[in-house]
Amino acid sequence: MTTRDGVWVVAACFNEEAVIVRFIERVLAVPGVDHLVLIDDGSGDATLDQIRIFLSQRRSLGVPVPLTLLELTRNFGKEAAMLAGLDYVRERCAAAVLIDSDLQHPPELIEAMVAEWRAGAEVVTAVRDDRDQESRLKVLSASWFYRVFNKVVDSIQLQEGAGDFRLLDAPVVEAFTQLRESSRFSKGLLPWTGYRSVELPYQRVSRVGGSTSWSPLKLIGYAFDGIFSFSVLPLKVWTGLGVLVSGLSLLYALVIALRTALVGPDLPGYASLMVAVLFLGGIQLIGIGVLGDYIGRIYVESKARPHYFIRSIDQG
């Protein structure tokens, strides 16, 4: 078994050619950082080349570089890339720091995170205290997501503004990497492990290069992944709605029966009949969709496919 030693920084990279060299230099300049692990998640630009050129230049100068590059065979997604990095450092590090490679997470904050860890923290979570650079719609939608998630999920509570920028003690890394589910939601999985967390506020800066790969649809899908991964309340909601609609239907049938007995039958109401049929049909289709989402997740989990494949490992 490899000896666990030092603080290892883990960062997934996807199309970050404009900033990746600056990111490497800033991370390695932080006091307390012992090693940097970059995971190229199938980048389509020159990200991989930029990292290899950096390594080659340092080697030609005879300068040792505490940097390891994991090249995945394709784009498996950020969650899988982070897991690949943590799998690699699991038996090598005393603590691991998860950080984005686009420089919106300030690498200099790692020094304060390490200080909290050395003081006894098991998890150090960087929490955004400023969202002025984002649109009003994005701020409101994010706030709505956290409120809904914390209401429908009993086992954990998410801290608004907390993302993937965290320091994890070695036992936390070990526990987290044991969770091998396919639909991963790290923001929820890390609190679910139950380790105590210390929070550090920070201000997220604008991107200095490149563009985000997270579209609004991807963000919405990620939000639903989080809720469906940690709660069966959507199933219970549709069960309750079915009971409610059935109860109202029986009540309405009773009203019609009494009215017919007292004043005679009404003329056929085609409009009201169509409204009722379409309403019930819509309810049924939505309910089937919710049920299908859960069944689909069971199907994906049952195949137990690996989360990623590594093409090459390049150590500096």
What are these regions (language model features)?
Residues V27, G85, D102, V124, ...:
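Residue-level signature of catalytic and energy-coupling elements of molecular machines
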Residues D5, A12, L72-R74, R166, ...:
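Short conserved micro-motifs on helix faces and helix-strand junctions that flank
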Residues T2-R4, P64, E91, E160, ...:
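A generic fold-level signal
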Residues M1-T3, F185-G316:
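Hydrophobic helical membrane-anchoring modules
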Residues P66-R74, K78-Y88, P107-S186, V205-F224:
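Acceptor/aglycone-binding surface of glycosyltransferases and processive sugar-polymer synthases
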Residues M1-S135:
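Structured catalytic core of nucleotide-sugar glycosyltransferases
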